[in-house]
Amino acid sequence: MQPPELEIGMPKRHREHIRKNLNILVEWTNYERLAMECVQQGILTVQMLRNTQDLNGKPFNMDEKDVRVEQHRRLLLKITQRGPTAYNLLINALRNINCLDAAVLLESVDESDSRPPFISLNERRTSRKSADIVDTPSPEASEGPCVSKLRNEPLGALTPYVGVVDGPEVKKSKKIHGGDSAILGTYKMQSRFNRGVLLMVNIMDYPDQNRRRIGAEKDSKSLIHLFQELNFTIFPYGNVNQDQFFKLLTMVTSSSYVQNTECFVMVLMTHGNSVEGKEKVEFCDGSVVDMQKIKDHFQTAKCPYLVNKPKVLMFPFCRGDEYDLGHPKNQGNLMEPVYTAQEEKWPDTQTEGIPSPSTNVPSLADTLVCYANTPGYVTHRDLDTGSWYIQKFCQVMADHAHDTDLEDILKKTSEAVGNKRTKKGSMQTGAYDNLGFNKKLYFNPGFFNE
């Protein structure tokens, strides 16, 4: 009698059970939540997930729903190639995201004694029949793709966002740009999987509930969609306090993601102000810190993984409490009537400021610091569509990043923002500081050499 053949990888009965029930599993599971949980559990790497999402041109002949179904199927089939423990890890992942029917379906192929002798904390909380579960919205449904943290809650493992956020088409490059910049040179931007890292922090809530940044969730979605199209690895966070923010900043910039990346972008969206000439940043617990402390983190000694790499820091919040009302264009002709804005035609807006009550600036290389306004002035955010600056930046990037370098993108963004007005005629002007950013940065969306 021949001994049973030794199986390598996932047992055959498990592989066949997934394949046999593939359509049911797609129907019974949420793709975005399952994809994120598989990365967090270590079933798949971010690169593996991206490979399953790349349909090699098929989307041109498929509608959006069919594309998502195909990506869902490829995700599950990829798991069948992930070793002998992947099946039980998948069951655990399904329980963690409350897809209990799918978990029970996978469990049905085995005898009870073949299940792993452990159970996760999430499984203990949710291991009930589906009929007993109340269909409550997921955290993502209520607060968007950003991860918020309680006051003393640990940050946890660094996990890239892998959900899909819809948005306008981002035009794709037809080449890697740089040949026309022989004098200045260009930053290297050609990797498929290490093109860039985005750390996005969007603080919306504060101790005073009346100061909630209404509409700011639109900015998170716009930025995530844009940088997904640029092939960046994205870490989105929401309400964090000052201590959590700096721990997060250290954790991200010392990670292998940043070590291997070609470019780093940080966007911090919150309330800000200028106090005695120093620009301040506010966190969700009401604590305030000098903006310079955040910039200092990117010095060479503190951030060795980003030496000689382009660093883009975006601070789209108030830098004071003054309203920029501009000056009339008709100063040379006093008889020409001055235009007055009609209030009913303008959307409701909020400013991004802290209510009002130097040391030497360290040198930073290869760094662009981007602001939504000039020093001393407030910024504006539409309650329905998001902040003026972020929305215009995303729009200009989508239209021009395929053939335009970042500094020209910022100039075009500033021009577009400068054309907007509030009900009372207030405006704002974007600005940026070039700190040794001595080459051109092209994002080259959709084109890869590596």
Swiss-Prot record:
Coiled-coil blocks: none
Tissue: Ubiquitously expressed in embryos during early stages of development. In late third instar larvae, dramatic up-regulation in salivary glands and midgut before histolysis of these tissues.
Inducers of expression: By ecdysone; exposure of salivary glands and midgut isolated from second instar larvae results in a massive increase in levels.
Alphabetized GO MF terms: CARD domain binding; cysteine-type endopeptidase activity; protein homodimerization activity
Gene: Dronc
Note: The promiscuous caspase inhibitor p35 is neither cleaved by Dronc in vitro nor blocks Dronc activity in vivo.
Activity control: Zymogen activated by autocatalytic cleavage; association with the Dark apoptosome brings multiple molecules together to facilitate their dimerization and activation by autocatalytic cleavage.
A GO BP annotation: zymogen activation
Organism lineage string: Eukaryota, Metazoa, Ecdysozoa, Arthropoda, Hexapoda
Record keyword Isomerase present: no
SMART domains, sorted: CASc
Organism: Drosophila melanogaster
InterPro entries in UniProt: Caspase-like_dom_sf (IPR029030), Caspase_cys_AS (IPR033139), DEATH-like_dom_sf (IPR011029), Pept_C14 (IPR002398), Pept_C14_caspase (IPR011600), Pept_C14_p10 (IPR002138), Pept_C14_p20 (IPR001309), Pept_C14A (IPR015917)
Role played: Involved in the activation cascade of caspases responsible for apoptosis execution. Effector of steroid-mediated apoptosis during insect metamorphosis. Overexpression promotes programmed cell death. Interaction with Diap1 is required to suppress Dronc-mediated cell death; via Diap1-mediated ubiquitination of Dronc. Rate-limiting caspase in rpr, grim and hid death pathway. Recruited to the Dark apoptosome, an adapter protein complex that mediates activation of the caspase cascade in programmed cell death initiated by the intrinsic apoptosis pathway.
Keywords of the record: Apoptosis, Cytoplasm, Hydrolase, Protease, Thiol protease, Ubl conjugation, Zymogen
Residues making up the propeptide: 1-134, 321-324
CARD domain segment(s): 64-109
Any one cellular-component term (Gene Ontology): cytoplasm
Oligomeric and partner information: Interacts (via residues 114-125) with Diap1 (via BIR 2 domain); binding blocks Dronc-mediated cell death. Can form a stable complex with Drice. Rpr, hid and grim can out-compete Dronc for binding Diap1, therefore removing Diap1-mediated ubiquitination. Interacts (via CARD domain) with Dark (via Dark CARD and WD domains); the interaction stimulates Dark oligomerization to form the apoptosome and brings pairs of Dronc molecules together on the apoptosome to facilitate their dimerization and activation by autocatalytic cleavage. Binding to Dark stimulates apoptosome assembly.
Segments of this protein annotated with the region Required for binding Diap1: 114-125
Family membership: Belongs to the peptidase C14A family.
Reactions listed under catalytic activity: Strict requirement for an Asp residue at position P1 and with a marked preference for His at position P2. It has a preferred cleavage sequence of Leu-Gly-His-Asp-|-Xaa
Name the record gives this protein: Caspase Dronc
Catalytic activity, EC: 3.4.22.62
Main localization of the protein described in the UniProt heading: cytoplasm
Gene3D superfamilies cross-referenced by the UniProt entry: 3.40.50.1460, Death Domain, Fas
Active site: H271, C318
Subcellular location: Cytoplasm
